[in-house]
């Protein structure tokens, strides 16, 4: 029986800095894909329509999943340490930026501050706008300041903050391990 840490022919050495980059990048790619799958499941199967801020929070995952796969492949193929670290820094920045956006959205949901006017401002009276009124009857506006559901006290925005911070920590671990000489 062989251990996962035992070096095998054709594999990265267990102590290789590239192995840490590969592990971090692949973990981030998988978690980003799971987050997107959960968001799309909630939208398509459970009927939870995302607000504009919810959609914006997906962008980081759309970028992190393929970037993580590319970076993992680069680590597996023996890319230079500087490229691996740069890729992990980009993944860290994506995750931290998304955590900030998620915290902002959670604050909007909890009414700590006002959200963007396109999804949480006052409802504008379009009764004098002619045909626009007829169109509004068929369109449901999803507001950013209304939570569609909470689980253990957190909304999707709250869970996004936690997941994004986890991804940043994983990328940070990858940077620290890859930087070792």
Segments from the language model and where they lie:
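Short, Lys/Arg-rich, polar N-terminal cytosolic tail immediately upstream
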Residues: 1-21
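Interfacial segments of alpha-helical transmembrane regions
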Residues: 18-30, 77-99, 169
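Generic alpha-helical transmembrane segments of integral inner-membrane proteins
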Residues: 30-37, 66, 70, 90-96, ...
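C-terminal TM-helix exit segments that contain a strictly Trp-centered aromatic cap at the helix terminus
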Residues: 34-43, 96-112
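Loop-to-helix transition at the N-terminal end of transmembrane alpha-helices
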Residues: 48-63
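Structural signal for the C-terminal ends of transmembrane alpha-helices
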Residues: 70-78, 172-179
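Extracytosolic (periplasmic/ER-lumenal) interhelical loops and adjacent juxtamembrane/interface segments
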Residues: 110-155
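A hydrophobic membrane-anchoring alpha-helix module
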Residues: 138-181
């Amino acid at each position: 029986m062989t251990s996962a840490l035992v070096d095998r022919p054709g594999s990265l050495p267990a102590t290789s800095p590239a192995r840490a980059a590969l592990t971090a990048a692949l973990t981030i790619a998988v978690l980003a894909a799971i987050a997107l799958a959960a968001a799309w499941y909630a939208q398509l199967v459970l009927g939870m329509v995302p607000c504009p801020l919810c959609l914006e929070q997906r962008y980081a995952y759309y970028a992190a999943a393929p970037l993580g796969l590319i970076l993992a492949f680069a680590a597996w193929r023996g890319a230079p340490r500087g490229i691996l670290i740069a890729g992990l820094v980009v993944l860290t920045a994506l995750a931290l930026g998304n955590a900030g956006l998620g915290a902002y959205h959670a604050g909007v949901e909890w009414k700590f501050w006002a959200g963007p006017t396109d999804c949480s401002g006052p409802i504008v009276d379009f009764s004098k706008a002619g045909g626009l009124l007829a169109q509004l009857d068929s369109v449901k506006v999803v507001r950013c300041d209304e939570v569609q559901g909470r689980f253990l006290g957190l909304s999707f925005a709250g869970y996004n903050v936690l997941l994004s911070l986890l991804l940043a920590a994983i990328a940070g671990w990858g940077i620290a391990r890859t930087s070792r000489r």
